[in-house]
Amino acid sequence: ILASIGITLLAVMILLAMDRPPICTCGTVNLWHGDINSSGNSQHLSDWYTPSHIIHGMLFYALGWLLFVRLGIGGRNAAKWGITLAVALEAAWEVIENTPFVIDRYRSVTVNWGYSGDSVINSFADIGWMSFGFWLALRLPVRVTVALAVIGELVAGYVVRDNLTLNVIMLVY
């Protein structure tokens, strides 16, 4: 847990050093911001991309299980590092996602034409949401976890015409 906290704080410091705004430039911090085409998108604690971060956690749990349990990489006690690996991956993504290259890519190929990157508090919250997804995958049966991921993708896809699957496809191709 301490390593995960340290990684998260390092990501926050890097994002601040990259001149990302600490909070929404509107001056408020909202629990939910639902308009993906506004300047407040990806600036608050949760938004329509929160399900994607929860799904990241579920996928990272599966990756940790595969590496540490199924393949036995790292020995008997390696599985305890699953959450640390997940936080490191999510923190790395949050830093990469806020580089000019990725911000410009999002603007050019996704539905987020006005995307300007995340506020630091949003990135911090995204790491928290990913950790929640990891915890869900740890505690719930596999089929329930998969069902929740599919539901999250379908709802976000239907409501805002965007989700993790579409973002990956549009960013890569």
Where do the PLM segments sit?
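Active-site metal-coordination segments of metallo-dependent hydrolases
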Residues: 121-123
